[in-house]
């Protein structure tokens, strides 16, 4: 079933839900992910579009539809954040908007994809340049208005007209997590043991963006989908082990490489001794994505959608 969590009573071991009866638990997994912080810059809450949830994607899709159906010569888009989401989104939107698109990618640091392998970073820079995406590096967003964005570069303020601002920067934990009486770090993430259990609450497990986890070697676990996917396997095992009096396994993160989509028929990947970009990397990334689908039903639905989508797009033109 689906419901919104309003609170957790750890003493009575109850999960409180909005408009639903509360649920009791013997073991609890906290995997609420994170939220996009839009309160960092004046105007962002009102005028910037986050890009994290399915609801966010639908809102963005509707805004793009309106812009594409308008009489405007150009569609001006500013994407805040030169991380993975920002770069992939910039490439995809550049393909979608074509000659009408005027895209700029805004990054406060001196390079995009700061934690990415050099090969992937260079492939991304090449793709962005080929698609005409303007890079604003070492640039801070000062404020956002309905039709403009103010940027600071080397102490100089510049206001630029825009039709759409997309915010991909930062992560904050859900409000319900902050209300829990658990040990948390400065970002509000729940600190866990290497077995992914909440400190002083062995019946509760936490993983993903809301967890501050160190693995069996004491290394900080990155806040990536790849890490969360691996944590899920360990969590499932450890729940079973805790219920059957078997030893729990400390989490051991395995970095399997990195893949990024860079628009239509283009991607980059590194890992397991392989470095690949272009259409071959795009195909490899899609196959890996399909393989990672949780069930055969998901694989069939996604694969079928990939096959028929180009046909539908062609017929609708």
Which residues are covered by each model-predicted region?
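A Rossmann-like FAD-binding core segment of flavoenzymes
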Residues: 3-7, 95-194, 198-200, 248
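Conserved Rossmann-like nucleotide-cofactor binding loop
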Residues: 35, 85, 111
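FAD-binding core/adjacent interface of flavoenzyme oxidoreductases
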Residues: 1-78, 155, 166
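FAD-site-proximal beta/loop scaffold in flavoenzymes
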Residues: 46-71, 159-230, 237
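Cofactor-binding loop segments of dinucleotide-utilizing enzymes, especially the Rossmann-like FAD-
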Residues: 82, 108, 209, 264
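C-terminal, flexible cofactor-proximal segment of oxidoreductases
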Residues: 231, 236-317
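A short alpha-helix-loop-beta-strand transition element characteristic
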Residues: 2, 68-73, 102, 245-253
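Rossmann-like NAD(P)H-binding beta-loop-alpha module
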Residues: 60-107
């Amino acid at each position: 079933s689906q419901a919104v969590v309003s609170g957790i009573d750890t003493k009575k071991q109850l999960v409180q839900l909005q408009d639903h009866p509360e649920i009791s638990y013997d073991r609890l997994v906290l995997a609420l992910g994170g939220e996009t912080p839009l309160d960092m810059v004046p105007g962002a809450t009102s005028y910037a579009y986050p890009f994290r949830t399915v609801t966010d994607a639908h809102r963005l899709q509707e805004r793009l539809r309106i812009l594409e159906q308008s009489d405007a010569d150009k569609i001006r888009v500013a994407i805040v954040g030169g991380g993975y989401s920002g770069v992939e989104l910039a490439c995809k939107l550049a393909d979608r908007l074509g000659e009408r698109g005027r895209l700029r990618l805004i990054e406060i640091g001196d390079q995009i994809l700061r934690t990415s392998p050099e090969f992937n970073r260079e492939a991304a820079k090449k793709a962005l340049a080929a698609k005409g995406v303007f890079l604003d590096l070492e640039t801070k967003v000062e404020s956002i208005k309905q039709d403009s964005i103010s940027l600071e570069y080397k102490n100089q303020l510049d206001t630029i007209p825009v039709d759409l601002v997309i915010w991909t920067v930062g992560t904050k934990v859900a409000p319900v997590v902050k209300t829990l009486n658990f040990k948390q770090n400065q970002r509000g993430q729940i600190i866990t043991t290497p077995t992914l259990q909440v400190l002083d609450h062995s019946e509760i497990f936490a993983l993903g963006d809301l967890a501050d986890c160190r693995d069996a070697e004491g290394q900080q676990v990155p806040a990536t989908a790849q890490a969360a996917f691996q944590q899920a396997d360990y969590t499932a095992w450890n729940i079973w082990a805790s219920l059957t009096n078997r030893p729990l396994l400390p989490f051991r993160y395995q970095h399997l490489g990195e893949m990024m989509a860079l628009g239509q028929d283009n991607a980059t990947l590194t890992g397991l001794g392989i470095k690949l970009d272009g259409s071959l990397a795009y195909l490899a990334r899609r196959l890996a994505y399909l393989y990672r689908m949780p069930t055969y039903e998901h694989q069939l639905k996604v694969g079928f959608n990939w096959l028929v989508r180009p046909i539908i797009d062609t017929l609708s033109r």
